[in-house]
């Protein structure tokens, strides 16, 4: 009997030692995990509101800068189109070296005829001189006849030598002007097309601006969501750790079994892992936030996931009309229709005549007969009427008309799609708002339930699993509510961007 009693006492003593040892091991492992848990710290980060962040994005986003350059480029092209009404003035210079001088050899080509004509002139003058009575032939008349004969002799010798028209070196300069008087309306059409292209560049910039705002809202409130979720999970981790410590104390005094303590430890371990993952996600969102702001310093949002639940959205018709009247993509399609019409006019101009005024002032050396023959200046008018052309003018005209119909059909379909998208986004926004409001009471209920379960557990009226379930339920509802708030904000931003009413966004979000 004594041996049996001693054996039972020894078993109880050993089991008590094992329990104490298990409690100490569990306590040490949990303490090490608690030490590894790094608390959130954004105190050193610069806080930015959404408006301030948007201002920084407008000044530093390279995508927006690229579209600004596109607008400036379109403006230059518009000015270039207007300059087509100016005349074209060119200053040209020519230097030509001829293989041989330009000359005419009368003696070689017409030598017999020239000699015969010269002889006949001499013979005629001699006959005149012989037939004149001596009393009439005065010294003056005789001297005149001799002069004429000498002149014809010189002419004969001149005709017998080559006549030089131009030397081998020819240098000519010209100041020329060409001014189109009528081009079939092509120049006016090109100016209107350039103006439409500039408007289109402005609409592309507006579209890029709206999409960048949507991206900023997504990144900004994405970081807010990740921050608040990480804070919530950190609080859950602390709550599980506190509950685990209470379970350890109650196990030591024998109020609960070790399996209850192990359950509390498992819950704490899971909460710790979830908290670490949330912090990792937060670090990634921090990088995205710094990237969109083009900042190397750590920045943090100052806003919270809070929304104006008491403020009602405008009617759906307001957003639909605003979108159809001002959305940049629809404006771009409208510009494309106008550009297609102007292209049709440009194709028609190819069938019409063209009239040009031209003129030139020539600068020359005047050291040859050929250059002396060239006039110093000239002006004129030239016309051109295309009859047959291998460029496919008719087919290009037909293609431009088809482009008009294509752009018109795309605009009609785009308006239908945009109206459907606005309806969908509007209803999604209202749905998220209702869901957010409904979760407010669920959060209050979960908080009260956790409070009651913790009090009951401390009094031995509740189990460890009930406390853990109550805390996990509260955290899941809080995270769900924050996720719904984030979805509401993103949907609201999309709705405001579609209607080009970014200014209204700030009235519904803190």
Language-model region placement:
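Hydrophobic, lipid-facing positions within transmembrane beta-strands of outer-membrane proteins
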Residues: 171-177, 319, 377-383, 425
């Amino acid at each position: 009997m004594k041996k049996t009693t001693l054996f039972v006492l020894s078993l109880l003593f050993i089991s008590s030692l094992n329990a104490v040892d298990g409690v100490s091991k569990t306590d040490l492992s949990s303490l090490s995990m608690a030490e590894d848990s790094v608390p959130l710290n954004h105190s050193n980060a610069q806080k930015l509101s959404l408006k301030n962040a948007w201002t920084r994005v407008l000044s530093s986003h390279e995508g927006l800068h690229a579209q600004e350059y596109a607008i400036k480029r379109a403006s230059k092209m518009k000015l270039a189109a207007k300059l087509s009404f100016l005349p074209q003035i060119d200053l040209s210079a020519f230097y030509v070296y001829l293989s041989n001088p330009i000359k005419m050899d009368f003696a070689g080509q017409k030598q017999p005829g020239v000699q015969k004509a010269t002889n006949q002139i001499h013979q005629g003058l001699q006959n005149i001189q012989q037939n004149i009575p001596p009393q009439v032939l005065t010294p003056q008349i005789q001297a005149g006849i001799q002069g004429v004969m000498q002149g014809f002799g010189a002419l004969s010798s001149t005709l017998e030598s080559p006549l030089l028209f131009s030397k081998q070196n020819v240098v000519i300069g010209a100041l020329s002007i060409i001014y189109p008087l009528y081009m079939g309306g092509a120049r006016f059409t090109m100016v209107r097309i350039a103006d439409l292209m500039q408007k289109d560049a402005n609409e592309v910039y507006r579209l890029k601006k709206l999409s960048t705002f949507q991206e900023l809202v997504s990144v900004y409130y994405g970081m807010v969501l990740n921050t608040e979720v990480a804070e919530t999970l950190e609080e859950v981790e602390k709550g599980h750790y506190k509950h685990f410590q209470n379970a350890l104390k109650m196990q030591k005094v024998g109020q609960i079994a070790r399996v209850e303590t192990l359950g509390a430890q498992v819950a704490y371990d899971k909460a710790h892992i979830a908290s670490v993952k949330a912090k990792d996600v937060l670090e990634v969102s921090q990088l995205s936030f710094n990237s969109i702001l083009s900042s190397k310093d750590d920045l943090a949002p100052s806003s919270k996931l809070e929304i104006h639940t008491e403020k009602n959205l405008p009617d759906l018709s307001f957003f639909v009309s605003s979108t159809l009247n001002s959305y940049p993509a629809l404006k771009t399609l409208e510009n494309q229709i106008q550009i297609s019409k102007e292209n049709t006019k440009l194709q028609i101009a190819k069938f019409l005549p063209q009239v040009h005024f031209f003129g030139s002032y020539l600068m020359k050396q005047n050291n040859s007969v050929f250059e002396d023959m060239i006039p110093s200046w000239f002006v004129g008018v030239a016309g051109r009427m295309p009859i047959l052309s291998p460029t496919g003018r008719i087919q290009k005209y037909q293609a431009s008309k088809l482009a008009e119909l294509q752009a018109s059909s795309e605009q009609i379909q785009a308006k239908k799609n945009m109206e459907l998208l606005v309806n969908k986004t509007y209803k999604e926004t209202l749905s998220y708002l209702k869901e957010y409001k409904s979760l407010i009471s669920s959060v209050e209920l979960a908080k009260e339930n956790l409070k009651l379960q913790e009090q009951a557990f401390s009094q031995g009226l509740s189990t460890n699993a009930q406390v853990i379930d109550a805390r996990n339920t509260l955290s899941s509802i809080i995270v769900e509510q924050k996720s719904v708030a984030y979805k509401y904000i993103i949907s609201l931003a999309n709705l405001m961007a579609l209607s080009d009413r970014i200014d209204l966004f700030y009235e519904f979000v803190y």
